[in-house]
Amino acid sequence: MRVVLITLFLFIGAAVAEDAGIDAITPEEGKANNIIEAYESPRFQKFVTHCSSHVTQTCSGNDPLNNQEASRMNSPFGLSFCLFDSMEKCLADHKASLKDPQDNNNLASMSSLPGSIQNQPLLIETVKFRAVLKTCSHVSARYCFTNPNVATSALADCLMPSLTHCVYPSSSILLPPPPPPPPLI
C-alpha cells in the first residue's frame, strides 16, 4: 500500500512539475522581486473572488458566528490556517469543493485516480490551486501581521487586497514589502 501511495505522489509531483514548465519562478526569485505566485484558472478565480470577503470577515474576528476563530488569530501561523480553512469551507459551500463530499480526508480526484486517468487535468488543477491557496494564505497572514496597525478593524482591510493580489496579481495594486523587523536592543 505504501508503494502505491508513494508512486501516486511521485506521479502527481512529476505531472505538476511537467505542467509548470521551465519558466517557473523559483521561491528565491519570487522573494527577491516581491512576486506572489498566482493561480490563473477562471474556474477557481470566480469562487475565490466571491469567498474572499467572507474569509476576511471570519478570520479578522468580525464574524459574530465564528468567535472561536478569534483565539487562533494571535499569530500569522494561526491566521494562515484560518484563511486556508475558511476558503476551503466557502468553496465547498459553492460546490467548488477541493474535497470529495463522500471522503473528507482526500482530494476530490484522489480516490478516482487509480481506476481512471481521465481525471488527471482536474487533479493537476486542484493540486496547483491548493498549493497556491496555501502560499497565498501564508503570505497574506505574514504581511498583514507585520503591518504597523494590526488592530482587528484594520486586519480585514489588509487581508482582502492581499488575497486579491495573490489571485489576480496583474490587476491589483502591488503590495509594498513588509516593514523591517524592529532593531534588537
UniProtKB/Swiss-Prot annotation:
Superkingdom of origin organism: Eukaryota
Induction of synthesis: During nodulation in legume roots after Rhizobium infection.
Signal peptide segment: 1-17
BP GO annotations: nodulation
Assigned GO CC terms: peribacteroid fluid; peribacteroid membrane
InterPro entries reported for this sequence: Nodulin
Keyword vocabulary terms for this entry: Membrane, Nodulation, Signal
Main subcellular localisation: membrane
Keyword Membrane: yes
Localization (cell): Symbiosome, Peribacteroid membrane; Symbiosome, Peribacteroid space
Family, per entry: Belongs to the nodulin 20 family.
Protein name, per record: Nodulin-20
Protein source organism: Glycine max (Soybean)
